[in-house]
Design a protein with these regions (language model features):
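Catalytic alpha/beta active-site cores
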Residues: 1-138, 143, 162, 169-176, ...
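Generic secondary-structure signature for well-ordered alpha-helical cores
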Residues: 16-19, 23-24, 29-34, 69-81, ...
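A short, flexible low-complexity segment enriched in Lys/Arg and Gly/Pro that occurs
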Residues: 62-66, 166, 180-188, 354-367
Length: 407
C-alpha cells in the first residue's frame, strides 16, 4: 500500500477484513489468529520522506514516528511476514536530489526508524528483516547501477556495525525500483520508451528485487492500455530474452562501476555523518536542511538543462518544432463520489453510535498515552469508526505539522 500518514489505519483495516473472513470460514477461535499471523504484504509507512520531499504528511514528526514504530512492534508479534515499511528514496529523487543524496537521505531516514524502534524497546533482529526499500532509476546508467550496489553495501555495514544486528537477514537491503517519472518528457514522448528501458536495465543490473516501469505517455496523461502493456513487455523482455538475470552483479569488477560504487558510498556516508551531527534525520528535516539540499540540487539540474550543459533529447536539443500533444483528459465520475458519500452516510446511520463514541474516546486516551495504538485502531475500524473520524481524533491529540518557512 502506497500510503504513509494513515498507514497504521489502513493496516488496521486489512487486519479487520482478514479477521472477518476468518470468522466467515470457520468457527474455530484460533482461525483468526492464524490468518492474521500469515498475512503478507507491504505498507509504505515512510513518513520522513513526506516531510523531506513529497509533502503528504499530517502529524508532527515525533508523533508520526510513534505510529511507525507501533506498526513495527505490532507486526513483530501478530503479522511477522508483513513488510512494515518501504523506506523510499524514489520520492526524494523525484523531488530533485542527486543519486548520492537519494542514498544518503534514504538511509538516514532508515537509521531514524531503527533508532526509534530500539527506543520503543524492540530488538533490532526482531523487526529489521521486514524492512524494505524503494529506489528511483534515473538516466545515468552507470551511476544508477553503482548507486544500488553502494546502498546495499552501506546498509549491511550500518546494520552490522552500528546497530549490532546478528541476523544476516537484517543486513539485507531488499528493494523495489521504479523508473524515473520526472525523466519522462512531453516532447517526443516515444523517446521515453528508450529512457525507461535503459533505466529498467540499470535497476536489474544493480540487483533490484522488483521493478515498476513507467508508461511512455505519463508526462501527458495517465498511461493508456498500449503504454502500460509496453511497459510490462519491457520488463518481460529484460527478464526472459537478454540474459542479464542469469548472473548476480554482472557489472561487478568493472573499473568504472567499482570506482563509482566507492565514490557514492564515500559521499553518501559523509552526508549521513553530517545528518548525525545535526541530531539525526528528524532534526535535519525539522530544520529544513534536507529539503533545502534537495531544492538546491533540483535547481542546479534544471539550470543545466536550460543552459544546455545537460542534454535532454527532444527538449533542449534535437527538437522537431512539433506541438506538444495534449493527453486525454481524465474525467472524474461524479456519480462514483456521490455513491460513496451516500454509502458513508448510510453506514454512519446504521452503526451503534454509543459504541462508536466509546471507541473514539478510547482512541484519544491511547493516543495520549504510550501503549501501542494498533490494537485500538483495529478495534475502532471493527466497531465502525471511519478513517476520517480516526484522523480527526489523532489530529486533536497530535496536532498538525506546519513545515519551516524556507527562503
Amino acid at each position: 500500500m502506497t500510503i504513509n500518514a494513515p498507514a497504521a489505519v489502513l493496516l488496521a483495516l486489512y487486519i479487520a477484513v482478514a479477521k472477518e473472513q476468518a470468522r466467515a470460514k470457520s468457527s474455530d477461535n484460533g482461525s483468526e489468529t492464524r490468518i492474521v499471523h500469515g498475512l503478507r504484504g507491504t505498507v509504505q509507512n515512510d513518513i520522513l520522506k513526506e516531510y523531506a520531499a513529497r509533502g503528504l504528511y499530517v502529524f508532527p514528526p515525533n508523533h508520526s514516528m510513534r505510529l511507525v514504530t507501533d506498526v513495527f512492534a505490532f507486526c513483530k508479534e501478530h503479522t511477522p511476514q508483513w513488510n512494515t515499511i518501504s523506506i523510499s528514496g524514489y520520492h526524494i529523487r523525484e523531488a530533485g536530489s542527486t543519486a548520492v543524496q537519494e542514498v544518503a537521505f534514504t538511509l538516514a531516514n532508515a537509521i531514524a526508524y531503527v533508532q526509534g524502534a530500539l527506543e520503543a524497546g524492540l530488538h533490532v533482529d526482531d523487526f529489521a528483516p521486514q524492512l524494505a526499500f524503494f529506489f528511483n532509476a534515473h538516466n545515468d546508467f552507470l551511476e544508477e547501477v553503482a548507486k544500488y550496489r553502494a546502498a546495499r553495501r552501506m546498509w549491511a555495514k550500518i546494520m552490522r556495525d552500528r546497530f549490532n544486528a546478528k541476523d544476516p537477514r537484517s543486513w539485507m537491503l531488499r528493494f523495489h525500483t521504479q523508473t524515473g517519472g520526472s525523466t519522462l518528457t512531453a516532447q517526443q514522448p516515444m523517446n521515453n520508451i528508450v529512457r525507461t528501458t535503459i533505466q529498467a536495465l540499470a535497476s536489474v543490473m544493480g540487483g533490484t528485487q522488483s521493478l515498476h516501469t513507467n508508461g511512455y505517455d505519463e508526462a501527458l496523461q495517465l498511461p493508456t492500455q498500449e503504454a502500460a502493456r509496453l511497459a510490462l513487455r519491457t520488463q518481460q523482455i529484460i527478464a526472459n530474452e537478454i540474459g542479464v538475470t542469469d548472473t548476480v552483479d554482472p557489472l561487478g569488477g568493472s573499473h568504472v562501476i567499482e570506482y563509482l560504487t566507492d565514490e557514492i558510498e564515500k559521499r553518501a556516508s559523509e552526508l549521513i555523518f553530517h545528518i548525525d551531527s545535526m541530531g539525526g534525520a528528524v532534526k535535519a528535516i525539522e530544520a529544513g536542511w534536507m529539503q533545502a539540499q534537495i531544492a538546491e540540487s533540483a535547481f542546479r539540474y534544471q539550470t543545466e538543462i536550460e543552459k544546455k550543459e545537460r542534454i535532454i533529447v527532444g527538449v533542449n536539443e534535437y527538437g522537431e518544432n512539433e506541438q506538444i500533444k495534449s493527453g486525454s483528459r481524465f474525467v472524474v465520475n461524479e456519480e462514483v463520489a456521490k455513491r460513496q458519500h451516500e454509502r458513508l452516510q448510510t453506514w454512519r446511520a446504521k452503526r451503534d453510535a454509543n459504541q462508536t463514541s466509546a471507541l473514539m474516546s478510547q482512541l484519544e486516551r491511547v493516543a495520549r498515552g504510550s501503549e501501542n495504538i494498533m490494537p485500538c485502531l483495529i478495534a475502532c475500524v471493527e466497531g465502525g469508526v471511519t478513517v476520517g473520524e480516526i484522523g480527526k481524533v489523532l489530529r486533536k491529540v497530535f496536532g498538525e505539522y506546519r513545515p519551516p518557512t524556507m527562503i
